A protein has these predicted regions:
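Low-acidity, Ser/Thr- and Arg-rich intrinsically disordered low-complexity segments
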Residues: 4-16
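ATP-dependent carboxylate-amine ligase
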Residues: 18-47, 51-56, 238, 245, ...
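Phosphate-binding loop of NTP-binding sites
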Residues: 19, 24-220, 224-232, 236-240
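Short, surface-exposed acidic/glycine-rich loop or hinge patches that mediate macromolecular interfaces
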Residues: 86, 114-115, 296, 307-309, ...
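Short amphipathic alpha-helical face segments that pack within enzyme cores
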Residues: 95, 119-122, 316-320, 369
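Structural signal for short hydrophobic segments within the conserved structured cores
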Residues: 106-108, 217, 300, 437-440
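Acidic, Mg2+-coordinating active-site environments of NTP-dependent enzymes
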Residues: 162, 166-354
């Protein structure tokens, strides 16, 4: 049964962590040391070759010692914060990493977004000495939601954040109710020293709190002006109560099935928020939140330099994690004010006097959130849409027909389409109502970038809507064209 967090010590200032050292009992066993040496040697070789080294070193280390993640993490004095969910993982972990750094801590973070166990192991190796001793003192881990049940059998984080659960890659992931059951089964054995940080507005995520015997901290958006009626914010991925399977009712829907929900059949309802945005104002390049639920009841302003209501949720998740770490609100808000987007997450890249705004989209909910952000900021965008169908994207691209392009189509000034499934995307845009004279298919990543730039007047913004492997290819092309560094150099 979930235990609410009520400690009055939240938001107390945490000083810089004390110096630490490993005792002989804490030192990694010989097998972990061997795994560390093998992984770090692989990392060094890849770096000599100019490669990113964000996954393979971890794969090598785990082949030598399957417990390397748990053993390397165990030496971190402040424990680990793990962040999972369908959307928002990379942004939230970056925000948490910035916050703990602002508090004087030294995070170990899989910052590149490589979020399978191999990516997590690679990040730990990058931080560790050759003998396996950490240089950092707190882990900030982005975890792929399908991998969490396996990872949690070996790793017990101090904090586990779940951002949301939406329908995603149907050929790779379970349907969300099955995934939720697996997550609940993995959460059940966690010790009561682990704090869950859950999205109260997502009924599937909120119900995970019932699987945990330790503290649970809920966050959400309380602003009555954010959201609308059921069905107005995209296709819902969850219409049934996670407890009794009765129909859910909503007084306000923010996105898909996220909002102010309740079940008339069994009485389950959106839980009280420990941290909430009483007001959210979204601008073209930033958002302002007024935070309720802090000590004293004041509405504290929080500015984040990225637009979109979904980024308000990411910021709330990060602030809730900071609260669970006893990092002060002023420290956390200062860190968020200086936040710089991760690659592909509303990242802006200057090119020939234009700005390319990269937006990773991988499922209908994420696409609809991006579309909503474009519409609510009044843009008439020039689009570069890149659709791939590799394993990391989803082999099944039929999900693009669930994205609400019809809402965006009248605002599109021009669209360049590229990728392995460019013609599927072009057909989708055509059926959404984009006239053929405003739509062009361009094969080749660099050629598509050049075409989008050439079409846009100097000073204009090009919004790049891209799936994951297409993002990697576009980012590589942008690097080769001299507009940006490789993402692993960030």
């Amino acid at each position: 049964m979930a235990v609410p967090l009520t400690s009055s010590s939240f938001w107390s200032e945490r000083s810089s962590p004390p110096p630490f050292s490993l005792t002989d009992m804490d030192r990694p066993p010989i097998r972990t040391t061997a795994a560390t040496i093998a992984g770090k040697a692989t990392r060094a070789a890849l770096q000599i070759l100019g490669r990113g080294a964000t996954a393979l070193p971890g794969l090598v280390a785990l082949a030598v010692d399957p417990d390397a993640i748990a053993r390397l993490s165990r030496a971190l004095p402040h424990g680990a914060v793990a962040v999972t969910g369908t959307n928002g993982k990379t942004t939230t972990t970056r925000m948490v990493s910035d916050i703990v750094r602002a508090a004087g801590w030294a995070p170990v973070h899989n910052r590149s977004g490589s979020n399978l166990d191999r990516g997590l192991a690679a990040a730990l190796l990058a931080d560790a000495t050759w003998s396996g001793e950490p240089r950092g003192n707190v882990g900030i881990y982005e975890l792929d939601e399908a991998s969490v049940p396996r990872i949690l059998t070996r790793l017990h984080p101090r904090i586990l954040v779940v951002t949301n659960l939406f329908r995603d890659q149907l050929d790779r992931y379970f349907e969300i109710d099955a995934l939720a059951r697996r997550l609940a089964a993995a959460i059940g054995p966690l010790p009561d020293t682990t704090t869950l940080v859950l999205n109260a507005d997502d009924p599937i995520v909120a119900y995970l709190g019932n699987a945990h015997r330790g503290p649970v901290l809920y966050f959400g958006v309380d602003d009555p002006l954010i959201g609308g009626a059921l069905g107005s914010q995209g296709i819902s991925d969850a219409t049934r109560c996670p407890r009794c399977h009765g129909s859910l009712a909503y007084t306000r829907v923010v996105l898909a099935h996220v909002g102010d929900w309740s079940c008339a059949q069994c009485g389950l309802a959106r839980p009280p928020r420990d941290l909430a945005a009483a007001r959210v104002v979204v601008g073209p390049a930033s958002s302002e939140l007024r935070i309720a639920g802090t000590v004293g009841g004041a509405l504290d302003p929080v500015i984040i330099p990225v637009p979109g209501v979904y980024n308000a949720y990411n910021a709330l998740a990060a602030l809730a994690a900071a609260r669970a770490l006893d990092i002060s609100l002023p420290t956390a808000t200062r860190a968020l004010a200086g936040y710089r987007p991760a690659f592909g997450r509303l990242e802006a890249i200057a090119a020939e006097g234009r700005s390319l705004r990269l937006v990773l989209v991988k499922n209908p909910a994420g696409f609809n959130a991006a579309i909503s952000t474009l519409l609510e900021t009044g843009r008439r965008p020039r689009i570069l849409a890149a659709l791939n169908d590799r394993d990391a994207d989803s082999r099944d691209v039929s999900w693009i027909w669930d994205a609400d392009f019809e809402a965006l189509a009248p605002s599109i000034t021009h669209a360049v389409v590229t990728g392995l499934r460019a013609r599927d995307m072009a057909l989708r845009l055509k059926y959404a109502g984009v006239p053929s004279e405003r739509l062009v298919v361009v094969d080749g990543w660099a050629a598509a970038i050049r075409a989008a730039i050439a079409d846009a007047p100097v000073g204009d913004e090009i919004v790049v809507l891209t799936t994951y492997t297409a993002l990697l290819a576009l980012r590589d092309a942008l690097s080769r064209l001299g507009y940006v560094k490789q993402f692993w150099e960030d």
